[in-house]
């Protein structure tokens, strides 16, 4: 009887640890198939890391978005995220080889440089583990931003 109780008491923590290891150890690598196109790589990185879950006007509420205590917080966070930047048009433009705005470029570049996204309260929740940019993804975004800025947003000095 006592062994059964201990087995049940340890099942949940052990299961959560296994899930955490599995989720955090599997980095996104889908973007690598676009090695010849930095713009598509960036679009893929933003999608894979679930940036559009908050930074898109079209993002559906997550399953916990209507729960009594957490729901209003989630809804307010999503509204604030879209107010800061809606990545929908940018990702679509990148996927279709179209130019992006200099403002969106600067915001995404700054985020990659500073590591400020996703916020800790988002990335530390079990259902969002693994959404932070890794060093390779940051390098791709920074390189892309530098190249786009050089090609589209610099002028000859007099």
Which sequence ranges carry the predicted segments?
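N-terminal Sec-pathway targeting helices
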Residues: 2-13
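C-terminal capping alpha-helices of c-type cytochrome domains
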Residues: 112-120, 126-155
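Extracytoplasmic electron-transfer domains, predominantly the class I c-type cytochrome c fold
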Residues: 72-127
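The canonical Cys-X-X-Cys-His
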Residues: 46-59, 117, 141
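Solvent-exposed, polar/charged alpha-helical surfaces in well-ordered, non-transmembrane soluble domains
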Residues: 44, 52, 72, 76, ...
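Electrostatic cytochrome c docking/interface patches
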Residues: 26-46
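Short cysteine/histidine-rich zinc-coordinating motifs and their immediately flanking basic loops
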Residues: 63-69
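Bacterial N-terminal signal peptides
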Residues: 13-20
